[in-house]
Amino acid sequence: MYCLQWLLPVLLIPKPLNPALWFNHSMFMGFYLLSFLLERKPCTICALVFLAALFLICYSCWGNCFLYHCHDSPLPDSAHDPSIVGT
């Protein structure tokens, strides 16, 4: 389970509030995970545990899934603040 210490913090990285950055964030996270899996070659158990955790987070629509945004989950209140989102 040594390799999980490098995979589990990836699930804690928050998604940006600005919807324009969601695509860039998901591409970065996808390429990071792909390069990690190709370079470090984690054991099968660690990879399955991580993929199960990723599936459960995305399936529950908590809003922290970096693969897509659930349309049922509302944006946080701070996402509508012009001082945070920008112009």
Curated annotation (Swiss-Prot):
Q: Report whether Nucleotidyltransferase shows up as a keyword of the record.
A: no
At the top level, the lineage of the source is Eukaryota
Q: Which UniProt keywords apply?
A: Cytoplasm, Membrane, Nucleus, Transmembrane, Transmembrane helix, Tumor suppressor
Q: Which InterPro entries match?
A: BCALP
List the membrane topology term(s): Multi-pass membrane protein
Please give an example of a GO cellular component term from this record: nucleus
Q: Which residue spans traverse the membrane?
A: 19-39, 43-63
Q: Which residues form a coiled coil?
A: none
Localization annotation: Cytoplasm; Nucleus; Membrane
| A family per Pfam | BC10
Q: What is its main location?
A: cytoplasm
The family assignment reads: Belongs to the BLCAP family.
What's the stated role of this polypeptide?
A: Acts as a tumor suppressor; induces growth arrest at G(1)/S checkpoint and apoptosis via RB1-dependent and p53/TP53- and NF-kappa-B-independent mechanisms. Modulates expression of genes involved in the regulation of proliferation, cell cycle and apoptosis.
Name the chain's protein.
Answer: Apoptosis inducing factor BLCAP
